[in-house]
């Protein structure tokens, strides 16, 4: 049994992330960028104008659908999470300052990957028995590639459903409970026995909240995400900017460190001299993927419910999503840490303590502890919401609507389990399946790349179309 567990958490995890996902992200991102004429760069202004530029306009959705904004905030709910805070901190600690450069590179290519995922999701979605729009990799495989390729969609759903209990549930609940404990300990340190009871109470409360929202369907998830995601993101951005500009003299040197060590991690010497280039590249690319999920295909499930007639217009939200998540929020986390001048123990895995120390340079330790704890709590909560939808849709595709209800009940129970138990092995196995999701998704993306290119050409470049 131990050998099987080691295979899933070690060998298979390395193969999935290092030898499959990362090369597919680079090669696939470049290929899709070329086929679609680099619209994430050439039409970036148009994409922002028609996504973030419309955020505060009143939108209404038809039956069985959510507004485009609710769709993107539901997807962002799952992606803007602990990866933006803890993941970015780990990228720097384990890969050096230069890891931020590779995080950016993966995001620039990831914008086109997620654009393609969302575009295909709208193009090949369908109505379920309740009349709701459903879509994602399993549906663009089924309706785009035909019955001989259905095994690819089935594989995706199996991998995603298993991963939802780890990356989308237990790890996030652990973050919430840990954050609440940190916030309480900043004022009233709790004894071990009291902590266990508190964790159980927290788990029950979180499970109840998730249950109320989850059983309300995609519309309720979208309505909650639409309100929570922008608010929590804006507050985090504001406080990060205060720290960065509070150390304004370090902004230039911070960028200098990032670029100087992107290809030569040992350039600055000191504690970072033990970091190899491979570590810098791998941790930058991997943490970018953890943060924005481009290539995993998960966000396409949320976007499929959008009330829109244009696959390309919704696809633009995929570009915005990666930009907001990684280029903006992850970059601000990185600059907050580097500009603050806090000590970094390179080569050692870190949690939230690095970003907490950075915020403490401006706001003091007590406030910083509470703020980071609350930020992690909200980010993790919305991630659970997003992944509860992803897992539910995958189980629905495999077994039907009735069984998806059973999954939802199990998902809520696992929330309580995740609050009181440390299930590192289960989390590590789920992390492996999270990486495996990319395999069927990239098969479909490559096979249907011509469809995306055709839709993009018709929308942006055909002379008989309106000028965009």
Identify the residue ranges that each predicted region occupies:
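Membrane-interface loop-to-helix entry segments
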Residues: 24-31, 35, 39-48, 173-180, ...
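Flexible loop linkers connecting adjacent transmembrane helices
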Residues: 38-66, 90-100, 112-146, 343-363, ...
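N-terminal alpha-helical transmembrane segments of multi-pass membrane transport
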Residues: 1-82, 92-99, 110, 416, ...
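Extracellular/periplasmic helix-exit of transmembrane alpha-helices
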Residues: 115-125, 129, 239-257, 265-272, ...
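Transmembrane helix-loop junctions in multi-pass membrane proteins
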Residues: 4-5, 35-40, 83-88, 166-176, ...
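Selective recognition of specific alpha-helical transmembrane segments in multi-pass small-molecule
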Residues: 109-117, 203-218, 229-249, 282, ...
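Helix-loop-helix module between adjacent transmembrane segments
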Residues: 32-33, 106-131, 138, 142-174, ...
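Alpha-helical membrane segments and immediately flanking helix-loop junctions
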Residues: 59-94, 120-138, 142-144, 155-161, ...
